[in-house]
Amino acid sequence: CLVGSEMCIRDSGNYKRIIAFEPNAKNFEKLKLHCKGMANVSLWQLGSYSKNTELIFNNKAGRNSAIADKGIATKVATVDTILCGMAAGYIKADVEGADFETLIGMQKTMESCKPKLNFSAYHRFEDIFRLALYIHSVNPDYKIFLRHHPYIPAWDTNLYCI
């Protein structure tokens, strides 16, 4: 798991290593509690992006914290930088609209080890096409699926790539 959520962490079961990013301080504390006592878990209080930098986050949105004009300065890094050549088997990302930038920042990982991907495709209307086209351009061996989940509220539409 990478860029993990509570459910991803809780349901991981048999894993070699979990690496999770969470830029929001309050959510990061919750993540630490959920992972307490788990082996081989690395938690990073930062966001994922196309480059290593600092961005402004609106943390007032709680679970939906996102890049904004006003807010808190937050460190972000590429997945490739954090993994530093380590293989990844599965990457789940719900990065509130920074999905395309996160994919750019993990290009080497997608090329070298083709991890299974689970990315949100509903934050920006163009993401349904843009994300799939980019993933295919980086590694045409991916099979790409789109699934809409019947949750309430009903906006969870994800790309699954295997």
PLM regions: where:
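Single conserved hydrophobic/aromatic residue that forms the stacking wall/gate
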Residues: 1-4, 8-9
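Conserved SAM-binding motif I beta-strand of class I
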Residues: 17-22
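Conserved SAM/SAH-binding beta-strand->alpha-helix loop
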Residues: 24, 49
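Conserved SAM-binding loop
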Residues: 31-32
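Short, conserved active-site loop motifs that form the nucleotide-linked donor/cofactor pocket
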Residues: 41-42
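Short internal loop-to-helix segment that lines adenine-nucleotide cofactor pockets
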Residues: 51-56, 61-113, 137
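A short, conserved beta-to-alpha structural element at the edge of catalytic cores
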Residues: 114-130
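Binuclear metal-ion centers of metallo-dependent hydrolases, dominated by the metallo-beta-lactamase
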Residues: 128-162
